[in-house]
Design a protein with these regions (language model features):
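N-terminal sensory and localization modules of signal-transduction and trafficking proteins
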Residues: 2-18
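Solvent-exposed, extracytoplasmic
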Residues: 94-108, 179-230
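Short, hydrophobic-rich beta-strand element in sensory/regulatory alpha-beta domains
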Residues: 81, 111-116, 202-205
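Extracellular/periplasmic juxtamembrane segments that couple receptor/chemosensory ectodomains to their
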Residues: 232-298
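Juxtamembrane extracytoplasmic/periplasmic/luminal helical "stalk" adjacent to the first N-terminal
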Residues: 16-93
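Short acidic/glycine-rich beta-turn/loop cap or linker motifs at sensory/regulatory domain boundaries
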Residues: 117-122, 208-212
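Extracytoplasmic/periplasmic sensor domains and loops in membrane signaling proteins
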Residues: 100, 125-155, 221-259
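Extracytoplasmic/periplasmic ligand-binding sensor regions of membrane-associated signaling proteins
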Residues: 118, 122-196
Length: 299
């Protein structure tokens, strides 16, 4: 009986030891699962952040390049206007003025040259008259002697970018003017904006601080965007507070990036102040396109 009791105790001890080993094994497996899940979450978060950083960095580089090209175009054309202004001040002969401007047009490629009044009326060198519906208070800016760049659309013509240089009054063919200006179709300006990012699937915009669009170089959009901030208010997932912060960043000429959802599509948005007329340049690309592009690079 004593031997039997000892055997039972030994058997019970083995069962207890086996149970503990089984419990430790289960605990170890559960711990490994928890660790693996934690690592997976951290890895997914790391990959997501890496994709975000790489994509926004690429967009920022392309945007910065376009920004520099736009600033150079503005600088160059404002310089041309000052040269033309100097010529006009020293040349009273109107036939000579017309020949000079027409030659300059052939050399530089602008659409037209305008003798411009403070309220937007104009005369060309050929004597054609009309009205430039400009997007700003021309009178106020000319009064401050500012060089101006803004967009306009004449009846029956495509959108144009207009460069304006103030002048201390002048007269051409009896038309009294307060400034001279040259224009380019937006298509000519768009060639300066590098849209090579992500196989040409990134949209570019140039906007005023209040969101009005100066240049729209969007892709895969059916509707024209007239005001970028208004578009965000209507279609994005951004709160009013976030939109206000973004508007302030545009007004201050700041640079930055963020994720934004428009309708059912998520995008990366990057922006950079241009130092031209308080404009901001924007780049916008779908996250799906970014992820697909990076998958091709990684795999």
């Amino acid at each position: 009986t004593e031997v039997s009791g000892m055997a039972d105790e030994k058997h019970e001890s083995k069962r207890s030891c086996h149970s503990r080993q089984k419990w430790f094994s289960v605990a170890a497996i559960l711990l490994l699962i928890v660790l693996a899940a934690g690592l997976s979450v951290r890895y997914i978060s790391f990959v997501s952040q890496t994709i975000y950083q790489e994509s926004t960095t690429h967009l920022e580089e392309v945007l910065h390049k376009s920004n520099n090209m736009l600033k150079e175009m503005v600088r160059k054309n404002v310089t041309y206007l000052h040269l033309y202004n100097g010529f006009l001040e020293n040349t009273p002969d109107e036939d000579e003025i017309q020949a000079y401007i027409e030659e300059a047009q052939q050399n530089t490629g602008f659409v037209d040259f305008y003798f411009l009044t403070y309220d937007g009326n104009y005369m060309t060198v050929t004597g054609e008259t009309g009205y430039l519906g400009l997007q700003a208070n021309l009178d106020e800016k000319l009064a401050h002697g500012e060089d101006i760049v803004m967009n306009t659309a004449l009846p029956g013509k495509a959108q144009m970018l207009v460069f304006v240089c103030p002048k201390n009054h002048g007269s051409y063919r009896g038309f009294a003017y307060d400034a001279i200006a040259i224009s380019y179709y937006n298509d000519a300006v768009l060639t300066l904006l590098d849209n090579s990012a992500f196989q040409g699937n990134a949209s570019n915009y140039v906007i005023y601080p209040d969101g009005r669009v100066v240049i729209d170089n969007s892709v895969n959009r059916k509707e024209t965007v007239y005001n970028f901030i208004a578009m965000l208010r209507s279609y994005s997932d951004l709160s009013e507070e976030q939109i206000t912060e973004l508007s302030n960043a545009f007004a201050q000429g700041s640079s930055g990036n963020l994720r934004v959802k428009l309708g059912d599509t998520s995008y990366y948005l990057v922006y950079e102040g241009t130092a031209v007329q308080s404009w901001t340049m924007l780049g916008l690309v779908s996250t799906k396109i970014v992820n697909a592009s990076l998958d091709e690079l990684w795999f």
